[in-house]
């Protein structure tokens, strides 16, 4: 789960009437997206031009550096920091250092930068560049693991240039998304598919952008749309605002991916809002980010215990945001909630032969491959799955209601999340402990 990109610039526009707020947010978001669309169109055109590898590499590096300067504060400083991460990581990767060492080194650099900014009271600058660096670190780590897997002492320019192209791809520098090395080159090498198909991609992209801007307006102007009648409603609206700002980023990047001819799915808001389980919520929140963590952290199984591997994966996810207690405690809470629910539902499914596990039985050959006595369509399974769907919706409120506007521009204090969760009697944690206890009894 991740919302690493700054959204503070739009949250400042909430005051005033609904019409004024909506207009200001729509203009601000469209201005940001239109710049990125220009980059997408430019590089869609460039990829069809037969230029040499050397020229292509220089174009990518120059344009990416310019993009970082264009979208961030302290333009030159941001470009230097961005390229410093690249130079150090690539130098270590070429020397066959482990991907884990490079990931740990980049996280250490990120935390050092955060402390430096904090010392000079520039926390807002760090928050503005954090999302860019997080995606950058993920790509650098992917390159490091690829080089480690290749295990070759002979490093040719053609191979090096392919990694540089992957790391320095301007349309994905600001909002992402993260693509694996294979996904990126599948997208880059895709041929022109004809006017009708390309027009279809453009229409889908424009629809995604329209939905993204609509959700951005609701996220920033939610108290103009809805008047909370209780504290719970206010908490639910705060959590909704956090989610919808995340959907704005995801749908925008989905539009860019579609324009460039890739079929990678970034996120489907409906699969998050109405998820079968908290496990599905986590995996659907940002699918490329989840893929990175699953492939490079969880599947490598540094520990014998599944629980330890789950919490280690969520810990790495939180550290990619820097030392952010609010994000760390939220991600670890989600990990604990998802783990306890998954264990309980797995036990419940096996004990009573019901299709109620956190993941639905797979569909093969257009038919449900379910060997349970009580399938998804039976009454008791439907009721139990509906209960967990509603519980997942509550967990979204519980974990998202801590992201209030009070400290969003400078970072949240240590006890902020605990105080807000205390107003709900730590209910999601209590439910999770109950699930763990019941899974031992059943």
UniProtKB/Swiss-Prot annotation:
GO terms for cellular component: endoplasmic reticulum; endoplasmic reticulum membrane; membrane. Belongs to the membrane-bound acyltransferase family. Porcupine subfamily. This is Protein-serine O-palmitoleoyltransferase porcupine. It comes from Caenorhabditis elegans. It is a multi-pass membrane protein. The chain crosses the membrane at residues 26-46, 51-71, 84-104, 125-145, 157-177, 199-219, 247-267, 319-339, 381-401, 418-438. Disruption phenotype: Embryonic lethal with severely defective embryonic morphogenesis with no endoderm and excess mesoderm. In addition, embryos have defective mitotic spindle orientation in the 8-cell stage ABar blastomere. GO terms for molecular function: palmitoleoyltransferase activity; Wnt-protein binding. Key regulator of the Wnt signaling pathway that mediates lipid modification of Wnt proteins. Acts as a protein-serine O-palmitoleoyltransferase that catalyzes the attachment of palmitoleate, a 16-carbon monounsaturated fatty acid (C16:1(9Z)), to Wnt proteins. Serine palmitoleoylation of WNT proteins is required for efficient binding to frizzled receptors. Has a role in cell specification, specifically in blastomere signaling. Involved in cytosketetal polarity. Required for the orientation of mitotic spindle axis. It is found in: Membrane. Keywords: Acyltransferase, Developmental protein, Membrane, Segmentation polarity protein, Transferase, Transmembrane, Transmembrane helix, Wnt signaling pathway. The active site is at 321. The gene is mom-1. One of its GO terms (biological process) is lipid modification. Pfam families: MBOAT. It catalyses: [Wnt protein]-L-serine + (9Z)-hexadecenoyl-CoA = [Wnt protein]-O-(9Z)-hexadecenoyl-L-serine + CoA. InterPro entries: LPLAT_7/PORCN-like, MBOAT_fam. Its EC number is 2.3.1.250.
């Amino acid at each position: 789960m991740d919302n690493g990109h700054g959204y503070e610039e739009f949250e400042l526009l909430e005051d005033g009437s609904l019409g004024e707020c909506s207009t200001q947010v729509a203009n601000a978001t469209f201005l940001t997206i239109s710049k990125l669309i220009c980059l997408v169109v430019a590089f869609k055109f460039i990829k069809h031009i037969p230029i040499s590898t050397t020229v292509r590499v220089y174009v990518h590096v120059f344009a990416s550096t310019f993009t970082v300067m264009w979208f961030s504060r302290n333009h030159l400083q941001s470009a230097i920091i961005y390229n410093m991460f690249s130079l150090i990581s690539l130098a270590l990767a070429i020397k066959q250092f482990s991907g884990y060492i490079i990931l740990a080194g980049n996280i250490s650099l990120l935390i050092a930068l955060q402390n430096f900014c904090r010392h000079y009271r520039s926390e807002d600058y760090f928050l503005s560049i954090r999302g860019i660096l997080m995606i950058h670190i993920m790509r650098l780590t992917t390159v490091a693991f690829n080089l480690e897997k290749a295990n070759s002492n002979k490093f040719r320019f053609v191979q090096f240039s392919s990694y540089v192209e992957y790391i320095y791809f301007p349309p994905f520098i600001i909002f992402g998304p993260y693509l694996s090395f294979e996904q990126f080159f599948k997208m880059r090498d895709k041929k022109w598919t004809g006017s009708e198909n390309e027009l279809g991609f453009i229409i889908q992209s424009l629809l995604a952008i329209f939905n993204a801007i609509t959700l951005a307006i609701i996220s920033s102007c939610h108290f103009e749309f809805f008047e909370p009648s209780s504290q719970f409603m206010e908490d639910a609206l705060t959590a909704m605002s956090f989610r919808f700002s995340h959907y704005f980023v995801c749908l925008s990047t989905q539009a860019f991916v579609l324009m460039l001819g890739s079929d990678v799915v970034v996120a489907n808001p409906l699969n998050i809002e109405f998820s079968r389980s908290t496990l599905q919520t986590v995996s659907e929140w940002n699918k490329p980010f989840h893929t990175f963590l699953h492939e490079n952290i969880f599947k490598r199984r540094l520990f014998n215990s599944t629980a330890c591997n789950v919490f280690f994966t969520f810990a790495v996810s939180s550290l990619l945001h820097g030392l952010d207690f609010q994000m760390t405690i939220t991600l670890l809470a989600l990990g604990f909630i998802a783990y306890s629910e998954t264990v309980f539902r797995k036990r419940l499914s096996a004990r009573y032969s019901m299709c109620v596990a956190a993941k639905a039985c797979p569909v093969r050959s257009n038919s449900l491959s379910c060997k349970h006595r009580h399938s998804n369509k039976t009454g008791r399974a439907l009721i139990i799955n509906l209960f967990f769907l509603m519980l997942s919706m509550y967990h979204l409120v519980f974990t998202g209601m801590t992201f209030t506007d009070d400290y969003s521009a400078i970072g949240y204090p240590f006890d902020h999340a605990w105080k807000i969760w205390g107003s709900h009697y730590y209910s999601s944690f209590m439910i999770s402990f109950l699930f763990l206890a019941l899974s031992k009894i059943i």
